[in-house]
Amino acid sequence: MAHKKGVGSSRNGRDSKPQMRGIKRFGGELVQPGSIIVRQCGTKVRPGANVGLGRDYTIYSMIDGHVKFEDYSRTQKMVSVVPAEAEA
């Protein structure tokens, strides 16, 4: 007879936290400096005028203005921020 009791154990039960990637501000929306526009893996969306690119490829606004998306290539888009005064 066994003297040790069988102990059930699961090798599953781990999960990574979500990365919350995607478009955060859409075309035409008003943004302030530092506003995150896109969180992404790699440069699926390219940075244009008046935006910065973080080391994790996050695109953020550098000025006050409106978000503008344009086609960059067949598979990529480009995002820029147009100054609010220039729009009016």
From Swiss-Prot:
One biological process GO term for this chain? translation
Q: Which domain of life is it from?
A: Bacteria
Q: Does the keyword Ribosomal protein apply?
A: yes
SUPFAM superfamilies listed in its UniProt record: Ribosomal L27 protein-like
Stretches the record annotates as Disordered = 1-22
Record keywords, A-Z: Ribonucleoprotein, Ribosomal protein
Which InterPro entries does this UniProt record tie to the protein? Ribosomal_bL27
Q: Might you report a single GO cellular component term?
A: cytosolic large ribosomal subunit
* GO function term, MF aspect, one: structural constituent of ribosome
Protein family membership: Belongs to the bacterial ribosomal protein bL27 family.
Query: What's the name of the protein?
Result: Large ribosomal subunit protein bL27
